[in-house]
């Protein structure tokens, strides 16, 4: 069990009374409700598994109790309504909101709690990063009209808007992995009493909202709002666009996600993301240390009171991150590969014992080590046997044959499970599933192995992956088609679609081209958006679709439409056919029949079922 001394000390010491997290929310808006299903595979297999939650992980959830914490004279932090905290800084004649939560319903509840403290109007909102749990509750605190009228300024790093929209290129796979990562497809029985390591579970079905920033900066912004002097600094860490806020008058640091919620940080997320450079991260922590803050309010977890406590936490975090980075690089330079590195790179005792802050509720050392290797050297480990490996199915077929055949391997996997070795049981069953995806005895055995591993995990994200994979393997209550539809709804709310530029829409075509259908096709289509004074083109050229930054001189077809019409089409409120027939999309330079031919060369996103494990 964890050492509770630090858990209690940093969580409550000195916090004035009264005392309250994608991207990346847990259950994203619009994911399909999953049918009630047995929590274990034992209903249809002899490999019964007793459901449960690791006791330390369960106890960790106590820090996310819904509560308003007061820090200093004028700062209030709402913990427990969303994965991300929402912070209110009260000024002379208005308030500043820092981070808004993952969806609008919980944000409205937080706003109502804040109004019990003060009725001063919101004058500014600060997004500390682009992750959905920080930005998608914004309309619970502000209206688009007030922002447009200049009554409220929204401040963020200059790259935030691009970060919000750029992940659409890999939306289907990233959305699927995010659903697994945060338990979005799990049955109610498997999330009851759970937290997500860095915050509580988000409510399912919440509405994602967004208002674009109205003021951005690159490295540093010194600004006074409502009489509150603030120093905003760019601190790349959990997100590349992360910013922290130092309130110089009170000496209080709003540390964003640079320091997570009493857990080892996620130096690389399992859902997938661009490389997070650990060197940037610990240097960002050093930048925060230079403020010598009297208190620290993170965007996840509880506030920390006392300059010595703040320094101890910041120092140990930066040392842990640097230690993992440096020792991974050192051992890489000895020739070690990722599988070998995770066996030797561990936190030293003095850092590992800094509990609960270094417990692996959200991030882990091992996944950080693998990411560091990949970040420096890529996928190739140096053994040419990796260069032209046998296809996965053929390799599995040969291995199973060598092991004595399917029945022998299944029996060995069953024995491994019964002997308390679920990892080996799962590895053996994987070979059988590779050969035959419909081998249900093997699938149920692997699912039981994953449940055994998952229920024991201290890490919430690993638990989610194990149990989500088990659900896929078991098959009942799991519909990959519905999951894709739910993901599409989750990332195509009206506000998020409005934030997507016309250029981004057209730029998205190339990665969806069905190359096999266009190897003998050449076709150029132009797109005009007169209301935003933009025009682009797409040239299909024998299996490649090239984006053109300007309207091509010669086109086979040109479509003219307003950005607002494009948004209605993207949201499914209007079909392209009806838009053309209704005159809101004009077709020139070619017959309207060519429109269907052009769009037919591209895959529609979120229409292909994705299975991550049964393959």
Regions found by a protein language model. Give the residues of each.
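Conserved beta-strand hairpin/beta-sheet module of binuclear metal-dependent hydrolase folds
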Residues: 65-118, 244-257
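Feature captures hydrophobic
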Residues: 35-40, 412-415, 421-427, 434, ...
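Active-site metal-binding motif and surrounding structural segment of the metallo-beta-lactamase
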Residues: 68-71, 92-94, 104-154, 216
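Metallo-beta-lactamase
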Residues: 70, 94-96, 102-104, 162-234, 280-292, ...
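Accessory terminal helices/loops
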Residues: 28-58, 172-177, 182-198, 202-203, ...
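N-terminal secretory signal peptides and thylakoid transit peptides that target proteins
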Residues: 1-15
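C-terminal motif of bacterial Sec signal peptides marking the signal peptidase cleavage site
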Residues: 22-23
